[in-house]
């Protein structure tokens, strides 16, 4: 979710109309920080309500789960992913599509995206399992993480 809050703030600063929809009001320390920054940009936020129709949105950022997700999507997250998939919007997934396992690319219900932006590194799950049929175009966003060889050389 933290990636989504950063993206929302950057888009708002660029003059793009943004709305954050939360599945719950529970944040990690980093998530709370970046959510507060997004809200400071004047971005409205609301809690997900079952049955919400997302068909009026042009673009949706899928930032529900990241590469550490394993298991089955349930509850509000499952409802939100179904709505994303029915929206007809251009869907951008951060790191990996919500619902896909970052190691295996397997998953039941998952977000189907037009574009998946890997943050820092590609994950094995981008190329395995169901991933090739649901990730859309895949690009990597270099965030300046040094390759292991350079880190070891620095030590």
Predicted features and spans:
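YjeF_N-associated NAD(P)HX repair module
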Residues: 57-155
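Nucleotide and nucleotide-moiety/phosphate-recognizing core
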Residues: 1-63, 72-94
């Amino acid at each position: 979710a933290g990636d989504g809050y950063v993206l929302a703030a950057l888009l708002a600063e660029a003059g793009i109309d943004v709305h954050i929809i939360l599945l719950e009001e529970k944040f990690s320390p980093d998530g709370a920080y970046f959510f507060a920054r997004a809200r400071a940009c004047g971005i409205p936020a609301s809690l997900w309500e079952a049955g919400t129709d997302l068909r009026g949105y042009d673009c949706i950022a899928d930032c529900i789960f990241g590469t550490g997700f394993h298991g089955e999507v349930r509850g509000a997250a499952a409802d939100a992913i179904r709505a994303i998939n029915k929206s007809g919007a251009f869907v951008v997934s951060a790191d990996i599509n919500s619902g896909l396992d970052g190691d295996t690319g397997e998953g039941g219900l998952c977000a189907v995206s037009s574009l998946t932006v890997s943050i820092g590194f590609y994950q094995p799950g981008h190329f395995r399992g169901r991933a090739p049929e649901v990730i859309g175009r895949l690009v990597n966003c270099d965030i300046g993480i040094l390759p292991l060889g350079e880190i070891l050389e620095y030590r």
